[in-house]
Regions:
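Glycine/serine-rich anion-binding loops at beta->alpha junctions
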Residues: 77-100, 104-116
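General beta-strand structural signal in soluble alpha/beta enzymes
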Residues: 106-110, 132-135, 150-153, 197-200, ...
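A glycine-rich helix N-cap at a beta->alpha junction
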Residues: 123-149, 219-225, 229
């Protein structure tokens, strides 16, 4: 078998089989297939597409290119959730404790942030002392004992994905739905959970900018998971405005704790209840109305918040900051961005908000950048809100005053104020399961 023939077959619109995909992917991981040939295959896939069966086979090969985590040592159904990313996307810190408090095991591996999108592991490490690297034995023991652990992704899972993504990033082949679906699902399958809920974000601050693309990505990922015997569903959620009011690691942890204590922003609370409810449905806890009520009840009785504190304590975190957000270390400097005129916030580009937060030190511009956990933005006025000239739109936080100018310029570049209000998008557009699409 030759890589040349595999490239030519896909270039001409052919369908690759498992053996060919395995030869290409495993050869690339081993160093036998050079970058230029894998680049050519990725571009051929980008231009020609893949059948659902091909995408499922590619995902399987990628998943098996590294360690496959066997969670059978953990009793009961294990549930996982993946978000395709966004700004102010702090839902994992809310829904994982909710679901665990309802008796479903959460053994989750999460990632770090890059560019305008934040990462769950960075947010967790904003809680002083929190360990996000556990041995497998520690991870399993914690989930068996308290029902929940969230740790950083192992570099040994879906090894092919890391190499292939780095290549896609520099060869203009990132925006290909079969390649996005196989990248995400290879890691989810390797991580071993029985039930997987996918949060496919859509809008300015998301990778998928339109509903058709988001639905197709969701459909393909659900099909992959179902083909591999997992219970999978996806929600298409809005990312035309950040969730909640805070962007930045410690700021987002504080806001997440407010939701778990029943006093969080309504948009973030609603999306989290929908996500948690759907995870509970996948885990066999009942239909959606039943599971929604279950999720609401563990917030109301405080058990979800206590479950979150239990998780952080087990991983070495100082939970006093969870109980009292004022105990988080604060940024040295703040800056108020005020409205230039009266009117409605008609547009507030979410990617620019995320990039402004990163410029303040809350995110990474490059992978090796360090993070200032206290830095970030608190939004006082969001998309659709009315504002008066001179009124504060948001507060910027940083440990270096010189960072404000570039961040303010970035934020202002995406801000439009008009006399008429915009049409606000729904929080959740649709649910995608193996049975089809349910639009809301």
């Amino acid at each position: 078998m030759r890589m040349y023939d595999i490239i030519a077959k896909k270039r001409d619109g052919g369908t690759l089989n498992h053996e060919e995909l395995s030869f290409a992917v495993n050869g690339y991981v081993a160093g036998d297939v050079p970058d230029y040939q894998m680049s050519a295959l990725l571009m051929a896939i980008y231009l020609r597409g893949m059948t659902d069966e091909e995408t499922a086979m590619l995902t399987d090969v990628m998943a098996h290119s590294g360690d496959m985590v066997d969670l059978s040592a953990i009793a009961g159904i294990k549930a996982d959730k993946h978000s395709t990313g966004g700004v102010g996307d702090k839902t994992t810190l809310v829904i994982a404790p909710i679901v665990a408090a309802c008796g479903v095991k959460i053994a989750k591996m999460s990632g770090r942030g890059l560019g305008h999108t934040g990462g769950t592991i960075d947010k967790m490490e904003a809680v002083p002392g929190t360990r996000t690297s556990l041995t497998q034995e520690e991870f399993f023991r914690q989930v068996n004992e308290i029902g929940i652990s969230v740790i950083g992704q192992s570099g040994k899972i879906a090894v092919a994905d890391k190499k292939m993504y780095a290549l896609r990033d520099v060869t203009a082949t990132v925006g290909c739905i079969p390649l996005i679906a196989s990248s995400i699902m290879s890691k989810k399958l390797a991580a071993g959970s029985d039930a997987i809920l996918l949060d496919v974000t859509m809008g300015d601050g998301a990778f998928m900018k339109d509903l058709d693309g988001a639905l197709e990505l969701a459909r393909q990922m659900v099909a992959i998971g179902t083909a591999h015997g997992r219970k999978v569903a996806a929600l298409i959620t809005d990312m035309d405005k950040p969730l909640g009011h805070n962007i930045g690691n410690a700021l987002e942890v504080a806001e997440s704790m407010a939701v778990l204590q029943g006093k969080g922003p309504t948009d973030l609370t609603e999306v989290c209840l929908q996500l948690a409810g759907n995870m509970l449905v996948l885990a066999g806890k009942g239909d959606m109305p039943t599971c929604r009520k279950l999720a609401e009840s563990v917030i109301a009785d405080g058990s979800a918040f206590e479950k979150c504190c239990q998780m952080f304590a087990a991983q070495g975190g100082d939970i006093s900051v969870l109980r009292d957000a004022d105990k988080f270390q604060k940024a040295k400097y703040s800056y108020e961005l005020t409205a230039p005129a009266d009117g409605y916030i008609y547009k507030n580009d979410v990617e620019k908000i995320g990039n402004a937060s990163a410029l303040l030190g809350a995110g990474r511009i490059k992978k090796e950048d360090s993070i200032d956990f206290a830095a970030g933005i608190t939004m006082h006025k969001k998309l659709g809100d009315y504002v008066k000239a001179g009124e504060s739109i948001c507060t910027f936080y940083a440990d270096d005053e010189s960072l404000f100018a570039a961040a303010v310029e970035m934020y202002r570049g995406g801000l439009v104020i008009r006399d008429e209000p915009p049409t606000l998008p729904p929080l959740v557009y649709a649910r995608v399961t193996s049975d089809g699409v349910e639009r809301f």
